[in-house]
């Protein structure tokens, strides 16, 4: 019979919060359909670990993955070409792009990137700063190991 690894077991601990923070936490649980406070707290911890992994690890190791979501006015002259030029000039690998037409004026592009964290963030800032770009959000990902 296998004995459970202590790292795999769920540990109960308590947290002290001000009432307004607890109320906000409970509102998010309901709004996002979590089954418990624990589920939301686990997700928040995982998100923070990914964020910290991006900051703490060697930023030049080239192993970071991110998704850049861009919404832009496709009528803006030469914007598509400038976005492509920035991607090609970057030291970041563009693994995949997806382009959709949201409406008569707006397009949404997702760009999956791999590279070092500084280059990926620089690419996001450059594209986000272009005239006609309405939204440029970078979602960071990490494949660090943790036990669930």
From Swiss-Prot:
The keyword Acetylation does not apply. It holds the Pfam family RHH_1. GO terms for biological process: response to nickel cation. Binds 1 nickel ion per subunit. The keyword Transcription regulation applies. GO terms for molecular function: DNA binding; DNA-binding transcription factor activity; nickel cation binding. Keywords: DNA-binding, Metal-binding, Nickel, Transcription, Transcription regulation. Its cofactor is Ni(2+). Ni(2+) binds at residues 88, 99, 101, 107. Transcriptional regulator. Belongs to the transcriptional regulatory CopG/NikR family. Homotetramer. This is Putative nickel-responsive regulator. It comes from Helicobacter pylori (strain J99 / ATCC 700824) (Campylobacter pylori J99).
């Amino acid at each position: 019979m296998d004995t459970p690894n202590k790292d795999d077991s769920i540990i109960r601990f308590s947290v002290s919060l001000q009432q307004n923070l607890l109320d906000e936490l409970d509102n998010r649980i309901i709004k996002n359909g979590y089954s418990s406070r624990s589920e939301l707290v686990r997700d928040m911890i995982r998100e923070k670990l990914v964020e910290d992994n991006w900051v703490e690890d060697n930023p030049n190791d080239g192993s970071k993955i991110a998704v850049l979501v861009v919404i832009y006015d496709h009528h803006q002259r030469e914007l598509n070409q400038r976005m492509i030029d920035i991607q090609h000039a970057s030291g970041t690998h563009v693994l995949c792009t997806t382009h959709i037409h949201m409406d008569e004026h707006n397009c949404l592009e997702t760009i999956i990137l791999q590279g070092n964290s500084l280059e990926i963030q620089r690419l996001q800032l450059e594209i986000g700063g272009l005239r006609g770009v309405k939204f440029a959000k970078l979602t960071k990902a990490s494949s660090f190991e943790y036990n669930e």
